[in-house]
Amino acid sequence: MFDRTVNAKFKPASSNAGPGNNPVRRNSMLTPSRGVTIGGTGGNIRKLTKVSSLTSNHHFAVCYPPSNIYQNSNNAGSNSALQRTTSESLRLNMMSRVAAGATPTTVSRASSNSSLATSTSTSLAPKSSSSSGGSNSTPQQQQQQLVSSNNSSSSSNNSFTKASSPNNNGARSVGGAATSAATGTTAAAGSHHHQPHHHHHHHHHHHQHHNHQQQQQQQTSLSQGHASLTVAGGSASAGGGGGGGSGSSSGTAAGGTNRKPKTTSSFEITSVTVGHPKLNAAGDTGDESADDLDESHTDDNSRITDLENETPSMSEDTFSKEEVYYANNALSTNAPVIPTSSQYGLVVVDPIAPSLGQTIQNVQVNVSDNIINVVSGAVTPGGTKKKDDIKETQHRSERFKVVKIESTEPFKRGRWMCMDYLDHSSVGNGGNNNEKTGSSTSEAHAATTDGGAAGVGAGSEAPAHKTTQSMILPPTQKLNENHLEANSTDANWNYAEQQQQQQQQQQQQQTIVGNALTKTLPVALRNVSRSSSVTRSPNATVEFLSPNLLAQQQQQQQQLFDSVNANAASSPNPAGDPNNMDYARTAAMQLHQTLQQLKQREDAMDVPPGAGGYANYQNGGDSAVGAASNNNSAAAATGESQLSTSYVEQQQQQQQPLSPAPLTPQAAPTFAAVAAGQSPNFQLEQQQQQQQATSQIDGIVPQPFNPQQQQQQTPQQSTAQQAAAAANATSAVTAPPPQQTSNTSNAAVTTGQGQTMPLLSHMTSYEQQQPNLGAAAAAAAAGGTAATSVAAPQAIPTLQLQSAPSTIADPQQLMVPQQQQQQQHQEEQQQQPQQQQQPLPPANIASASANNSNLNLTNTNVVATGEATTNALTLTDEQATAALAAAFATGAAAAATGATSAAAATQQQIQQLQQQPNAESETESFITASNPGGNRKRAFSNPHIGGPNDPSFMHRLNPQLYYYNKSQSGRSSFCVDESLWPTNNPNGAVSDTNLYMGSSTDEDYEEAIDQFSPTIYTTRSASRAIPIPNSAGSSPQHQMHHSQPRIAIGINQMEGGGPTRSTGAFSASPSIYAYPHSPFYASSPETSFGSAAMPGHPAASSRISFSYDPAFQRLQVPNASGDRRPRSPLECASVFAAVAAAATCGDAAGGAADTVISSASGTSAVAIDNKIEQAMDLVKSHLMIAVREEVEVLKERISELMDKINKLELENSILKSNIPQETLQQLQLQLQLAAPPATPAIQAAPAVQSVVAPAAAGQAVQQQAAGAVAVTGVATSPASAVVPTSIPNGSAENGSSAVESAAVSVEQQVQQVTSAAAAAASVVTANGPMS
């Protein structure tokens, strides 16, 4: 969306749109038609439409009555019921519109050419539309409805075209612009169908459409995805959105290219070219060819998926496979959350899109699944396609780029049923995020509901709620869906409402930011797409933002600076939106402002580069388009290095947050923040960085703050930023010096938030939103300008209080404390690193280059370098985990390598961040590169890919170091031989701890993550590591887990030189996540482990944080101090061996006990843990089966009893009717006398009560049983406690155990109720006959 908006596309649309605002957003393809059709309101309305039209229950058009109304009208027509028909009619209308507005089409075309965004818009739109529909899909639909509606709008036409490829193609083709406009109209309809495909967003898109009606009901389908997709749509818009082919025919070539990304989804064939030709004919025949792929829904879908998997889409060409892996990691992290919630974390984008305007929504539509897809599609049409496929494959289990739905229920899109997404979402993130879609959706709902008006007010924020993560986070959101699902989603979703509000704000803000981001992203992606597949991959995680970040990172230095300048004016927009809270109004204003700003920006930046904008984007023109695109980029532009750092951090964070939603939101917020506080570009940039970090982590929080503060304090950028970003703001205030400070502050704040965030991207995002808001506010109040460290700590405590409580209390609290610790440590470290970091940046950059090979590490590193301290902190902030990892890297590296370690640490942080997104493929290498000692065996799939990043860590790359214990679990877990690692750490002790921790723990961590039991706790960052939100997403979680372990490690070793740092953060947070694996109660010995930090072994001292998931008993290999190294590979062989080795080796610093514990949680422990997890999974599945069977039996029994009751009642009524009046009265008297205390009715009530009690008891028992097996501690978890009251939600949100418990409880309740009913009936019957 941003892309579109930013791109010329937006401009052209602008003319049509008239109102700068909407057009800006809508601008892309849609804008023209929309502008024409909807005009300024088009965007808003569209947005609204999404909200209202979609019928999203929550978003009633009501939200934005003014704008909505138009949209509503259109959408209204295309309400769910009409959905497809309406959609088609709309599409047809659109066609006529297109015809009428050939200009729009032309504009579209120009746009599309000038900017991928345009292409994206249309191209994605089709998918998007599908997405939109999906978006509109239910719960999310509501949230995403806003977005969806936008998407819908934008993709409606397209969507239909695409969705009902055969039918719609013609329509879509009808005009990219028209399509867009139609999309607005059809969006509602489209959004419905979106939902189905929301799951596989684009691929599904088609079937979805086909099924979309059926799925439409499924509205659960994450609208987030589509929202994100919309972004892609924007990019594809030129391509007619591929499906639209002609729809965005204008951007035919681009569109076509964009389209390609869609090819990713393997099952996109549904949208066959058949439809396309028609549309294309209507639109541009030429586009057809370009959009042929699109035409063949395979390509189209692929593209969409690619877009969804921004990474794949983006850099599929470049990093076809690797990147995909990264994407996978990112996605996985986001659960392909970002793609899913991330990708529906991308949902975050969805919100973003709305924020920006309809345009973004268009993009978002596609974006949902491939937020970055928009960008991606625009950027790497061809590559995306492969990528998508790869990505699908990549996504560990989500071959289809499964959106992370936040539910444990299998997600069904058309013919496709996704059972696996859940775990991904647990990874969460993220994005994570993916798919935090459910989460995002909920948030979206909440946001929509809360911000129904907010949706409008928030501009696209209401849709933004979509995020995640995903929305990843969502943004963000989506990530959370799966990745964070355990924490964020399950817990979060349990907390969903609180966080939803946060998310809503966040998302909305994200939406705004995201919109800008989206704009930026597509550009960035374009640049990045080819240049940095890696970005793409991470983008996959932070689908939406990541590309932005990456692109920005890559181009940031080049373009960002320009972008910032160009966008400076626009930036204020977000700031201009003072009503963050009053989303409805504020959103409207914000939207207008944002759109206007975007428009201005486009005019300023985009117009000039309008035609060449595309080239600019790809080349470096990003600055122009990118600037326009990157509203927030403006800030980036100013402090390019900072921004890049920020962006990189963002990217990292995005990548890192397993849930895309959080990332996206974070990134988006950052952009919004940047836009808002863009007054001083440089300051803004810093703010941006801070905000980005904060944003990303708090993406939601900062934005809420930012928008409000921005508006209020736009003049006072610093203040606004401070308030918004709290610590970030502080940095912003002290722009240049604060860069470090800001970074540090950011890191600190983010750490507080981000720490949790990375683990639970979504959860964190949501959580952080509140905490950040609170923290930011507190920090701001406490003295936003106060020392960053101070601000960060303040923020963190606030975060802790707010965050922990609001989100999964335990995980967040756990995380928060860790965050605090980490923040403090990091702050300390940052201060050290700050000193080092300034110098380090070059080194980091160099490292970054090395890292880049890994994945955008270069950019990330650059950012990290630029923000060495920031990196540690920011990353921490962005990714508490990453920060921890960074801290660990920094600390460990510092300790081990001294000054170099700072750079290395930064690098590692970056790597960690990046790796998290790439968790599977690159995580390890990143980490490896980052910290010599801290290198974790992140590269789960790709062991030590990062190795090359750091020459010093090259050895780490050595495969020898990593032993994949494939036997342990389906996931090969690294059993890194500590002995192998010695090279990694200059300081044996520190290194060892780090290594072991990094290696063993990290690997274990990853393994654990995979297992859902991120149990790596660094001594210091143990608590951070705790946020095992990662556990939720098995595959995607990988990254997250990586992040966590990194964080843990990072914190643990963060001080590097400061052994004191070893906080031995208690990993014992009872972070019981929905996923049994997830809850590794962080109460690992690590906590107790004070981490005797030896000078030589800083905090590395025995990291007894063999955190074993209570659920999985995963004994993380505690990081014993440097002596760990002595461990022989055999240790991996057996726990006992490990224990013995640990005992024998005993860290010099760590006590023998530590060593023992450490060894206990050695690699062997990991293997054992993996096995345990496997066993748990098996038990869980068996339990689930048994429960289901039992439920079925109970249902049967209940039905039998009901039949009996009915029969008896019937008999009774017959008897009564036949009884003489006297007898009846007599009988009644007898009944009264016979059962005065309990009339049937009265009796039933007590029976029910009793039933409830037993149900609760049964639930407790069940949970205990499940908990015992899964060691989830569900029985004692709040969720379980709550389950009785909220069984439906609880079951879905809590782990399978919780679900089982819930099921059992339900069964019991039903049974008891039935029995009670039977008893009551029998009483009546007995009495009746008695008389």
Curated annotation (Swiss-Prot):
Could you tell me which residues belong to the region Leucine-zipper? 1194-1215
Q: List where in the cell it is found.
A: Cytoplasm; Nucleus
Bias type Low complexity, positions: 106-165, 175-190, 553-580, 614-641, 701-734
- Cite the record's Gly residues compositional bias ranges: 236-248
**For bias kind Acidic residues, which ranges apply?**
285-294
Q: Which domain of life is it from?
A: Eukaryota
- Comp. bias intervals (Basic residues): 191-212
Q: Which GO terms describe its biological process?
A: chorion-containing eggshell formation; compound eye photoreceptor cell differentiation; determination of adult lifespan; dorsal appendage formation; follicle cell of egg chamber migration; intestinal stem cell homeostasis; mushroom body development; negative regulation of apoptotic process
Q: Name one GO molecular function term.
A: protein homodimerization activity
Keywords of the record, alphabetical order, are:
Cytoplasm, Nucleus, Transcription, Transcription regulation
Q: Which SUPFAM superfamilies does the entry link to?
A: Delta-sleep-inducing peptide immunoreactive peptide
Its function, per the record, reads: Probable transcription factor required for peripheral nervous system morphogenesis, eye development and oogenesis. May be required for the transmission of the dpp signal and for a morphogenetic movement of the medulla in the brain that reorients the second optic lobe relative to the first. Plays a role in determining proper dorsal cell fates leading to the formation of the dorsal appendages.
Question: Protein name, please?
Answer: Protein bunched, class 2/F/G isoform
Q: Quote the gene name from the UniProt entry.
A: bun
